[in-house]
């Protein structure tokens, strides 16, 4: 039986979002209609996240809610796919017999067949966007070859596999023609792009060719600090449509912890990388991510992390408590920092970053900048600068005045005020 009305719930990161969008395009080609709500559908498909405990719990909660709908007769069928299934397929099958099928992260044809749809190789480049139409993500690789001790992604997604450049360019053309203005380049590790196929980094070559397509903004996310091709920073400085922004998760600075994490980099090398990137492009904004409460992290080691963050003054920073993941190598270590202490350390680090962010945002006050509008409501426009990625970074809150502003438009704005994580101002012109 072909599923005519399907509700797809996509959980987790932007990589998962791309997987869902690819599936949607294939299914729509077979006549399947996607609904806005579960109540309109006869089938539910949940694309799960299984990266950390909170994500697992959210996925389980959504599956159980969908099972209730099936038991009530609201829907006829229920399927589950994605990272959680990749890790716990057998356990899920045993505990959730009401689910009609479980699929991993590399079973797109099988999922489509279960839904009553056909897989078409020629449609692989096509996606039905779940993001607003003016920005999206380009996933340039699958899997990961790194062996970070805290991470289960290699088990979930497999070894690193760069997507063919020509396929990525075809996909990018389709996205550009659909109206996408901001292209966010992602994978588990963009630094390694090309190493598995060409024996060297091909990231800069790809970025140059994407830049030639005249996207308004191209942004780099998920760069690993080891093997990052520094020529990309020079290209960023030279090409106006490549955002002066780099997301490069460092996770920690203490040498003992970095070694235990198997990050392949030490504190001094991290500092040198930061300094080199900033020297090559003084206008760049750096985003990073830190982990607090890694097994054995002492108060002194955490204080060292605080000092590192204060000294290097990252433009954007996220911090997460260490999660003791069953399928990560660090699960063999004793998880000896209490949950309460982990949360306290996260809060302390983010309080420090709040002060850094406030200082950096204050520098924008009185200046005129270009903003991409994401949302408009009741005389206010909400958008981002080139220094802010969707969903995770700062937001600009702008009074529109007499200007007719719509999502997806670029505008000139004057910044009049700021908070640690927002800029406030007014629209003074349209681009």
From Swiss-Prot:
Top-level EC class: transferase
Domain of life: Bacteria
GO MF annotation terms: 4 iron, 4 sulfur cluster binding; aspartic acid methylthiotransferase activity; metal ion binding; protein methylthiotransferase activity
Protein localization: Cytoplasm
Pfam families assigned: Radical_SAM (PF04055), TRAM_2 (PF18693), UPF0004 (PF00919)
Gene Ontology terms: biological process: tRNA modification
Limits of the Radical SAM core domain: 130-359
Keyword Cytoplasm: yes
Key words, A-Z: 4Fe-4S, Cytoplasm, Iron, Iron-sulfur, Metal-binding, S-adenosyl-L-methionine, Transferase
EC nos: 2.8.4.4
Reactions this protein catalyses: L-aspartate(89)-[ribosomal protein uS12]-hydrogen + (sulfur carrier)-SH + AH2 + 2 S-adenosyl-L-methionine = 3-methylsulfanyl-L-aspartate(89)-[ribosomal protein uS12]-hydrogen + (sulfur carrier)-H + 5'-deoxyadenosine + L-methionine + A + S-adenosyl-L-homocysteine + 2 H(+)
UniProt binding sites for [4Fe-4S] cluster 2: 144, 148, 151
Family affiliation: Belongs to the methylthiotransferase family. RimO subfamily.
Function field: Catalyzes the methylthiolation of an aspartic acid residue of ribosomal protein uS12.
UniProt-recorded name of the protein: Ribosomal protein uS12 methylthiotransferase RimO
